[in-house]
A protein has these predicted regions:
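Hydrophobic/aromatic beta-strand patches that form the interior of the parallel beta-sheet core
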Residues: 32, 85, 100, 159, ...
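Short catalytic/ligand-binding loop motif for oxyanion handling, primarily in non-cytosolic enzymes
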Residues: 14-15, 59-60, 93-96, 166-170, ...
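Conserved acidic residues
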Residues: 45-50, 190
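Aromatic-Pro/Gly-enriched surface loop or interdomain linker
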Residues: 1-47
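Acyltransferase
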Residues: 187-196
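Structural motif
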Residues: 49-55, 175-179
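Catalytic beta-strand/loop cores that center a nucleophilic Ser/Cys/Thr
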Residues: 119-174, 179-188
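A glycine-rich, often tryptophan-bearing local segment used as a flexible ligand/cofactor-contacting loop or short
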Residues: 57-58, 62-130
């Protein structure tokens, strides 16, 4: 069974997101939770994949607990065959301002796109189309979208798109990132009764 090292640091990483990922991944993977007090080199040496959940972590909080050596360690891990999984906040952290594990693409706020149907950063539901053609409603809380940056993009597979057709979930090499919350549990929706 492969090992996923799931980062957790409350409140930047939502406990609900972390627990949702553990619930979703545990039947298929060995999930080990790690935090800023752990030795990252050791964590990565024992893992097949490093994962980052959703939460409220912005650039300020990221730089409070991740130094350049941490970013380099994550990037080297991915370059040497390790996998990266990022959901919502973890999707943003794959981008050029953070771990920089994407090639020729970046992550920006979906709600800032001119044709986005969601315009505010609150809990709601996004209608997403999966790569196999069907659509589903998925929990959304200020998730990202994939856009080109100034470098030539390397190929990536679009696994799901937002209602406006922009990529919501992709796989590029060893990196898988998701803007919405497929790990969401039913009680999340109880916190936002207006989306029922």
């Amino acid at each position: 069974m492969k090992t996923i090292a799931l980062f957790s640091h409350h409140p930047e990483c939502s406990n609900e997101c972390t627990l949702g990922m553990i619930t979703a991944l545990s039947p298929h993977y060995r999930v080990r939770v790690w935090g800023i007090a752990d030795n990252l080199d050791y964590v990565l040496s024992q893992s097949d994949c490093v994962a980052f959940p959703g939460g409220i972590g912005d650039s300020d909080s990221y730089y409070e607990f991740f130094k350049r050596r941490h970013g380099n360690a994550i990037a080297n891990f991915v370059d040497n065959g390790g996998k990266y999984l990022g959901i919502c906040m973890g999707q943003y952290w794959a981008g050029s301002h953070y771990f920089d594990v994407l090639k020729g693409i970046d992550v920006v706020q979906y709600i800032k796109q001119p044709d986005a149907e969601i315009k505010r950063s609150y809990g709601t539901v996004a209608k997403v189309t999966m790569d196999y053609g069907s659509w589903k409603n998925m929990f959304f809380y200020d998730g990202g979208v994939i856009v080109p940056n100034n470098d030539p993009p390397e190929p990536y597979k679009v696994k799901a798109t937002y209602q406006n057709g922009m990529p919501m979930a992709i796989i590029q090499g060893n990196v898988g990132i998701i803007g919405c919350h497929p790990e969401s549990e039913m009680f999340w929706y109880d916190l936002y009764p207006y989306i029922r």
